[in-house]
């Protein structure tokens, strides 16, 4: 019957899900607890560069709040 495919389908789904989740957790672990930022457009790249300059430590993910900007 049709339900005989469910175990195989669930195993395949889990196998496809694991790399995506692992990548997200690895990026979060290596970037100080924040998600990895991706710059698809030039404007987003400029924002990341601005955040890197403002933080003062050459890391875009160590950002300061607006109250700490001179």
From Swiss-Prot:
Compartments it resides in: Mitochondrion inner membrane
Keywords on record: Electron transport, Membrane, Mitochondrion, Mitochondrion inner membrane, Respiratory chain, Transmembrane, Transmembrane helix, Transport
Pfam families attached to this UniProt entry: MWFE (PF15879)
Transmembrane segments: 1-21
GO cellular component, as recorded: mitochondrial inner membrane; respiratory chain complex I
Superkingdom, taxonomy of origin: Eukaryota
InterPro entries, per database record: NADH_Ub_cplx-1_asu_su-1
Topology relative to the membrane: Single-pass membrane protein
Cysteine-cysteine disulfides: none
Primary location group: mitochondrion
Subunit and interaction comment: Complex I is composed of 45 different subunits.
Task performed by this protein: Accessory subunit of the mitochondrial membrane respiratory chain NADH dehydrogenase (Complex I), that is believed not to be involved in catalysis. Complex I functions in the transfer of electrons from NADH to the respiratory chain. The immediate electron acceptor for the enzyme is believed to be ubiquinone.
Family to which the UniProt record says this protein belongs: Belongs to the complex I NDUFA1 subunit family.
Protein name as annotated: NADH dehydrogenase [ubiquinone] 1 alpha subcomplex subunit 1
Protein source organism: Pan paniscus (Pygmy chimpanzee)
């Amino acid at each position: 019957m049709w339900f005989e495919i469910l175990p195989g389908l669930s195993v395949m789904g889990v196998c496809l899900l694991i790399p995506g989740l692992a990548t997200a957790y690895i990026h979060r672990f290596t970037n100080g607890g924040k998600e990895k930022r991706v710059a698809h457009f030039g404007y987003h790249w400029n924002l990341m560069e601005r955040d890197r300059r403002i933080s003062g430590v050459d890391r875009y993910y160590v950002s300061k709040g607006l109250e700490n900007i001179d």
